[in-house]
Design a protein with these regions (language model features):
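Short, glycine-/small-residue-rich phosphate/pyrophosphate-handling segment
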Residues: 57-58, 62-81
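Conserved donor-nucleotide/metal-binding helix-loop-beta segment in metal-dependent transferases, i.e.
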Residues: 24-50
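Active-site acidic Asp-centered loop
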Residues: 19-21
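Residue-level signal for alpha-helix termini/capping positions
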Residues: 7-10, 39, 80
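Short phosphate-binding loop-to-helix
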Residues: 1-15
Length: 142
């Protein structure tokens, strides 16, 4: 479906934004900054925690995309091969997606004023800092 959407966009727009729907900390300011930067750049990529890709801004079909495990390096290498000079935009608010319970903890810590954090509070999700094998302990109250 993504390839079909990019084929549809080719010739109709200069660039596309490819982004998953599970980026709960993203805000208007974050997105505006990346879009403004993309006006002077051929290829912007935002990695996710764990080596994946959370956002790409590029010309439609500039590279073949493949999302999943360690896709970030694959996308950067593909952009390099096409001489697109990939620029990495490193942002906590755009790098966090929801894959683990620790990610829910990050939302509780950094997601002030987000709908996701409000919902997690309704579910009585609690987080505490720990310094063991995990950084955050996430529990659900009764």
């Amino acid at each position: 479906a993504l390839k079909q959407a990019m084929e549809y966009c080719k010739g109709k727009t200069k660039k596309v934004i490819i982004m998953p729907s599970d980026i709960p900390l993203i805000g208007k300011t974050n997105l505006k900054m990346v879009i403004d930067s993309s006006k002077q750049l051929d290829f912007i990529i935002i990695p996710s925690k764990g080596g994946g890709t959370n956002t790409i801004i590029m010309k439609p079909l500039a590279i073949r995309t493949k999302f999943g495990d360690f896709s970030y390096k694959e996308h950067v290498n593909a952009a390099d091969r096409k001489n697109l000079n990939p620029q990495v935009h490193d942002s906590l608010f755009m790098a966090l997606d929801v894959n683990t319970t620790e990610d829910l903890g990050e939302i509780m810590v950094h997601g002030e004023n987000t709908e996701t954090r409000r919902y997690l509070k309704e579910l009585k999700i609690n987080v505490e800092s720990v310094h063991g094998s995990e950084r955050l302990r996430v529990t659900r109250g009764s």
